[in-house]
Amino acid sequence: MGMYTELVMSTRVKEVPEVVGVLQYMAGNEPRPAELPDHPLFKTSRWEILFQCSSYYFVPRISVLFEHDDIGHYWVLISRADLKNYDSEIEKFIDWIRPYLEATNDDMIGYSRYEETREPTIYYGVP
């Protein structure tokens, strides 16, 4: 069967149209973009449902908010989901999104937690 890994994100995303379009799609707000970025994340079979997966092993259920902050001129991404991370979708997502975040290496952007692990993996912005 396999174990679940939880992903929780809370971060600011730069105003990059290609990135915003993909995240809008992943959040269920917009249709799939015609062109996808050239990154290993988009070669995985389940990247599209990364924010939509949920099991009974983690609480709460899925939650995703992706909205524009008109004052700060950035997008806010807040999400919580969990999936069987067979193809390292979580790590590939973090690798893809990190350069587009309004975050430094001191800013926590989220965490992941494997079902049988006590301590989460904390993710920070780019140095």
Named regions from a protein language model:
Residues M1-A34:
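Short, extreme N-terminal segment that most often corresponds to the first beta-strand
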Residues P37-P127:
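Charged interaction segments
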